[in-house]
Curated annotation (Swiss-Prot):
Native species: Methanosarcina barkeri (strain Fusaro / DSM 804)
Molecular function (Gene Ontology), one example: DNA binding
Species classification: Archaea, Methanobacteriati, Methanobacteriota, Stenosarchaea group, Methanomicrobia
Cross-referenced NCBIfam families: PRK00440.1 (NF001679)
Descriptive protein name: Replication factor C small subunit
Cellular component GO terms held in the UniProt record: DNA replication factor C complex
CDD domains: AAA (cd00009), HLD_clamp_RFC (cd18140)
Amino acid sequence: MEDSTIKEEIWIEKYRPVRLDQVAGQEETIERLKSYVATKNLPHLLFSGPPGVGKTASAVSIAREIFGEDLWRENFTELNASDERGIDVVRTKIKNFAKTAPMGGAEFKIIFLDEADALTSDAQSALRRTMERFSNNCRFILSCNYSSRIIEPIQSRCAVFRFRRLSDEAIRKRLEYIAKDQVLSITEDGYEALVYVSQGDMRKAVNSLQAAAFVEPNKSISRGTIYRTTATANPEDIRNLIETALRGNFRVARKELNRLLYEEGLSGEDIVGQIYRAISEMDNRMILDLGLSEKRIVELVDIIGEIDFRLTEGATEKIQLEALLAHFALSNPD
């Protein structure tokens, strides 16, 4: 593969779905949306779910299929509420687009408001009034990570669709397609690493693959490259760190922690996040091997949450992470 190809193209744009059928891992939701497209009878929509699961791609695909390739750009606009959280974005940008007539004989236009849960309560109230005022010639598609942060009057005016986190199989299938198209060689552990770092986020998976391909343009992409380019610890190292600390070997665990912090260059928050993930994903064999009771697991999760909070408040990474390992070691019944 040519190195210039990696530099010139942004893969999340190149491989973004352009039709609803191409949106991965949301089969039930997509089938319901396709029924709206088929009749061109579209209500206001609210898409809820984690990042990188197809919410934006679905909104754009709806516009493409309803208006056609020639007219969808004229009848569709996308705004990101996290950039402008206040009421002005509703009063100006949204109203200016909503009050103009649809182009090309279309019955309505579509306004896609991404990260709508970032809008303040006042801005959401203004948005609700705007939705009512322009309902004859405008349809709103709102996207959010947390539907609980959308005021009830807006939710009641929308058909709500919940996008789930993508399965490992859906992520891998898309990565295999891209690898074939880009003529990439990816090892089995490379695919496993991409699935691990993505955590069900297709956008993150594709970006991680492109970053690794840029670093190793003419080599087989393995898990080492993936973890290095995404600033992620090898999950095996995290499991070993946890196991060492839980067995009471604090000094050995601290040495491994220092390696992750200073040699691997990982952040404290990333390490805590991976420790939490490893604890959550422990299988029964490891739980039995370490002698972990249900009560002890609850205590571990509780202290992980406390350390994570302290780090977000600006506490010293090394001290907090060592305190976490110390808590693990002290919980050893031996």
